[in-house]
Amino acid sequence: MAVQGSQRRLLGSLNSTPTAIPQLGLAANQTGARCLEVSIPDGLFLSLGLVSLVENVLVVATIAKNRNLHSPMYCFICCLALSDLLVSGSNVVDTLLLLLEAGALAARAAVLQQLDNVIDVITCSSMLSSLCFLGAIAVDRYISIFYALRYRSIVTLPRARRAVAAIWVASVLFSTLFIAYYDHTAVLLCLVVFFLAMLVLMAVLYVHMLARACQHAQGIARLHKRQRPVHKGFGLKGPVTLTILLGIFFLCWGPFFLHLTLIVLCPEHPTCGCIFKNFNLFLALIICNAIIDPLIYAFHSQELRRTLKEVLTCSW
């Protein structure tokens, strides 16, 4: 499956669709059917990447600055930010390489192709590690709620560091294999199963945490004989928070893995071909997730926000 010139080179070998038409509208696929195609300009990719890059650099710098944030939970959050940083950074570099290939450095296509292969490995490994750290954060929060008294003995900093190292090593290893054997159906299926496993893990853990929180709120309400007001107020906040958290995860990552699934199930079907045409949009959603992650997992912390102000004012 060759990489088309107008497609993102980020894992672009997965996209076997014809060259995209640069506008939002109805485009004809190989069978003449009409389908909606959303073109994402290079400038938009570059802008999204730069915003995410700056945002996640601030998260990493903030956690590194404050020793009070050197805990297992913030270790996972920092690594999530680092993964998103690499996704964004590789996107920025990839966009610049696309522009350079069309410009003065077109004669050095071989050098750019080698650099692009390295970027593909970095991008793929950072995407896998980002999913892993989202799962690790969910597990950490689950343990902190259901094993609160033993949390500090279960989730220690050395164990968190070993988990982080294992995630990075596994991500680099599997991403290298993925890039090398991208045309094997088993590889694509493994990626899809991995995404579904992370989705199920997060859904089960967060739903269980929500149920425990509801039970706790009801217990407090009965204790103070104010069951209805407390239950009503919490009943709105809890499900809404859970819906936003899981909804954003599925919205940003789901289309990309749907793309991989359809490559296996119906690579030649006209309807699937219409979905393939929006490959660039699916990648843009992943970059958007890298922008949203710090807002959900990092900036909700008052301590982190206070330290962020010090970082922005250069109070080191």
UniProtKB/Swiss-Prot annotation:
Coiled coil: none annotated. Residues 64-72, 140-162, 211-239, 300-316 are cytoplasmic. One of its GO terms (cellular component) is cytoplasm. It holds the Pfam family 7tm_1. It comes from the Eukaryota. Belongs to the G-protein coupled receptor 1 family. It is found in: Cell membrane. The chain crosses the membrane at residues 38-63, 73-93, 118-139, 163-182, 191-210, 240-265, 279-299. Glycans are attached at residue 29. One of its GO terms (molecular function) is melanocyte-stimulating hormone receptor activity. Signal peptide: none annotated. A lipid is attached at residue 314 (S-palmitoyl cysteine). Keywords: Cell membrane, G-protein coupled receptor, Glycoprotein, Lipoprotein, Membrane, Palmitate, Receptor, Transducer, Transmembrane, Transmembrane helix. It is a multi-pass membrane protein. GO terms for biological process: adenylate cyclase-activating G protein-coupled receptor signaling pathway; regulation of metabolic process. Gene3D superfamilies: Rhodopsin 7-helix transmembrane proteins. Residues 1-37, 94-117, 183-190, 266-278 are extracellular. This is Melanocyte-stimulating hormone receptor. Interacts with MGRN1, but does not undergo MGRN1-mediated ubiquitination; this interaction competes with GNAS-binding and thus inhibits agonist-induced cAMP production. Interacts with OPN3; the interaction results in a decrease in MC1R-mediated cAMP signaling and ultimately a decrease in melanin production in melanocytes. PANTHER family: G-PROTEIN COUPLED RECEPTOR. Receptor for MSH (alpha, beta and gamma) and ACTH. The activity of this receptor is mediated by G proteins which activate adenylate cyclase. Mediates melanogenesis, the production of eumelanin (black/brown) and phaeomelanin (red/yellow), via regulation of cAMP signaling in melanocytes. InterPro entries: GPCR_Rhodpsn, GPCR_Rhodpsn_7TM, Melcrt_ACTH_rcpt, MSH_rcpt.
